[in-house]
From Swiss-Prot:
Name recorded for this polypeptide: Quinate dehydrogenase
Gene Ontology terms, MF aspect: quinate 3-dehydrogenase (NAD+) activity; shikimate 3-dehydrogenase (NADP+) activity
Annotated gene: qutB
Pathway the protein contributes to: Aromatic compound metabolism; 3,4-dihydroxybenzoate biosynthesis; 3-dehydroquinate from D-quinate (NAD(+) route): step 1/1
Example of a GO biological process term: chorismate biosynthetic process
SUPFAM superfamilies on file: Aminoacid dehydrogenase-like, N-terminal domain (SSF53223), NAD(P)-binding Rossmann-fold domains (SSF51735)
InterPro entries, per the entry: Aminoacid_DH-like_N_sf, NAD(P)-bd_dom_sf, Shikimate_DH-bd_N, Shikimate_DH_fam
Length: 329
């Protein structure tokens, strides 16, 4: 376990809390923002990774005790394995964190009585939302009243469901996943959080069923880039393929957000979608927008409106991913 560093040469410090932290873009992304804003801040990862070994990040009690007594602390990114476990230990949670079922960001909120609240939120919601809105041909209108599709059964799927419902106004959400139990868990959790949802979740596990349903206009894929091997994986991939190929007969071009961008930004699913004439949005776009939302919460500045800042962050991320793709890190 790495000690929690408080840098003496910086005015503010954010942390990246989790493990293993291999090739994370978060610290350099935030440094790009801080430099552009003229802030003497930094973000420090709380674990290290080399080869196949890594150091563990501190336990939650140790971490929170340290940051609560750190006058330079401005906020923290939170990643696995702490995104769910940390939630009950914080002073408050935003609706985004509660509905997504995970916290990826801690920020400070001053109360009227002068006390500081340590608040958990989920900026992945903003990342997915902005990636879809910025990448769609006509903004939110592209999605309203039309079906969307989620690929996967993990945290990304849960977050995407919330985003599609809250901000994009879709009519229904199909779920395609290899593991039926994961889908059942999503449905059970959703029923508990939203007893009377306006937008239904529709599991689809068979290509023939996909062929009879209204074609989606948006897809969020949140699975690793591995070739399907098992019968369930092959069926799920073929179900997705049927959905994607149907959109060529629709008036509007579909958009797909491929959240997997490591180790390579272009995945098998991205290629299938492009071949079916979908517009592919790389997952790095969601990374950028969620990072900018973190920076807004930590700095208190409207970072997106800062001239040239978004472009600097986009250029940095694009260059870094391109370099890593060449070396296949």
């Amino acid at each position: 376990m790495e000690p929690i560093t408080i840098p003496t040469d910086r005015d503010g410090v954010a942390y990246l809390y989790g493990h293993p932290l291999r090739n994370s873009l978060s610290p350099p992304l935030h440094q790009t923002v801080y430099n552009a804003l003229g802030l003497n801040w930094t973000q420090i990862p709380l674990s290290t990774a080399t080869g196949t070994s890594f150091t563990r990040s501190p336990e939650i009690s140790t971490f929170l005790s340290s940051v609560r007594s750190n006058p330079k602390f401005v906020g923290s990114s939170v990643t696995m394995p702490w995104k769910v476990a940390i939630m009950p230990h914080l002073d408050d949670l935003t609706e985004d964190a509660r509905q997504a079922g995970a916290c990826n960001t801690i920020y400070l909120r001053k109360e009227d009585d002068g006390k500081t609240q340590y608040v958990g939120t989920n900026t992945d919601c903003i990342g997915i939302r902005e990636a879809l809105l910025q990448g769609s041909p006509n903004g939110a209108e592209h999605f309203k009243g039309k079906p969307a599709l989620i690929v996967g059964g993990g945290g990304t799927a849960r977050t995407a469901i919330y985003v599609l419902r809250k901000w994009l106004g879709v009519s229904k959400i199909y779920i395609v996943n290899r593991d039926a139990k994961e889908v059942e868990a999503i449905l059970a959790e959703d029923k508990q959080r939203n007893p009377s949802p306006q937008v239904a979740l529709v599991p689809v596990s068979d290509p023939s069923a996909a062929a009879t349903l209204e074609a989606p206009v948006a897809v969020v894929s949140g699975i690793p880039n591995y070739p399907p091997q098992t019968e369930e994986e092959i069926r799920a991939r073929e179900t997705l393929r049927v959905f994607l190929n149907r959109q060529t007969h629709e008036k509007d071009q579909g958009v797909i957000l491929e959240m997997c961008y490591h180790p390579l930004p272009w995945t098998d699913i991205a290629q299938i979608a492009q071949d079916a004439r979908w517009k592919v949005i790389l997952g790095s776009e969601a990374l950028i927008w969620q990072g900018l939302e973190q920076a807004r919460l930590w700095t208190g500045k409207d970072v997106v409106s800062e001239p040239g800042l978004v472009e600097k962050v986009q250029a940095f991320v694009a260059q870094t991913i391109a370099e890593r793709s060449k070396s296949n890190l």
